[in-house]
Structures are given as structure tokens and as C-alpha cells.
């Protein structure tokens, strides 16, 4: 009984494999490589929301923080960085380096 079941499964597998080998690709698959798509088709599949748009496209680009260079200077000094955690960046920077 097991041998008959195994033989039937093998025959079914052979028919499936033979059917796939003889099949021809459709017109869309034969004209293009199956592994590659155009840039336009790829961008239609993966549409990411844009964070920053240019002004002429609708939304303005966010302005950079003018205090960011000073904040980085304060972060590089361990004492200023520690004090900034307690009393705030602007006050810590003022105490170490003068007016902001």
C-alpha cells in the first residue's frame, strides 16, 4: 500500500515538473527579464513619503537650527554637556563660552 502511494506521488510530481518545463512564458515575461524592472515600475511599487519638499513643489524646506553648531561644541565638552542636562543648553553654553 505504501509503495503504491509513493509511486502515485512520484508520478504526479513528474507530471507537474514536465508541465512546467514545457510551458512558454507569457508576452510580458518574454519581452523583459523576469528579475529586472524599470525604474518607473519600481518607483510605483515602492512609494515612500518624502520628508522635505522643495519650496516650488508645495511645502517649504525646514530651516536648519542656528544653535546647532554651538550645541555640538557644548556636547564635545563633557562638563558643558553635563551642565546642559541639568540647566539647559543655552545657559550651560553661556556659562562656559559667553553669550549665545
Curated annotation (Swiss-Prot):
Report the main location listed first in the record.
secreted
Report the residues modified as 4-carboxyglutamate: 68, 72, 75
User: Known post-translational modifications?
Assistant: Gamma-carboxyglutamate residues are formed by vitamin K dependent carboxylation by GGCX. These residues are essential for the binding of calcium. Decarboxylation promotes the hormone activity.
Q: What SMART domains has UniProt attached to this entry?
A: GLA (SM00069)
Q: Which residues form the Gla domain?
A: 52-98
What's in the keyword line of the UniProt record? Biomineralization, Calcium, Cleavage on pair of basic residues, Disulfide bond, Gamma-carboxyglutamic acid, Hormone, Metal-binding, Secreted, Signal
First and last residue of the signal peptide: 1-23
GO cellular-component terms in the record? cytoplasm; dendrite; endoplasmic reticulum lumen; extracellular region; extracellular space; Golgi lumen; perikaryon; vesicle
Q: Which residues bind Ca(2+) 2?
A: 72, 75
Determine the domain of life of the protein's source.
Eukaryota
Residues of the propeptide region, as annotated, are: 24-51
> In Gene Ontology terms, what is one molecular function of this protein?
structural molecule activity
Q: Quick one: which residues bind Ca(2+) 1?
A: 68
PROSITE patterns under this entry? Answer: GLA_1 (PS00011), GLA_2 (PS50998)
**Site, as annotated: Not hydroxylated:** 60
Residues annotated as binding Ca(2+) 3 are 75, 81
Record-level GO BP terms: bone development; bone mineralization; brain development; cell adhesion; cellular response to growth factor stimulus; cellular response to insulin stimulus; cellular response to vitamin D; cellular response to zinc ion starvation
InterPro entries reported in the protein's UniProt record: GLA-like_dom_SF, GLA_domain, Osteocalcin, Osteocalcin/MGP
Where in the cell is the protein located?
Secreted
Cystine pairs: 74-80
Q: Which PANTHER family match?
A: OSTEOCALCIN
Q: What does this protein do?
A: Bone protein that constitutes 1-2% of the total bone protein, and which acts as a negative regulator of bone formation. Functions to limit bone formation without impairing bone resorption or mineralization. It binds strongly to apatite and calcium. The uncarboxylated form acts as a hormone secreted by osteoblasts, which regulates different cellular processes, such as energy metabolism, male fertility and brain development. Regulates of energy metabolism by acting as a hormone favoring pancreatic beta-cell proliferation, insulin secretion and sensitivity and energy expenditure.
Give the record's family classification.
Belongs to the osteocalcin/matrix Gla protein family.
Q: What is this protein called?
A: Osteocalcin
**Annotated source species:** Homo sapiens (Human)
Please state the gene responsible for encoding this protein. BGLAP
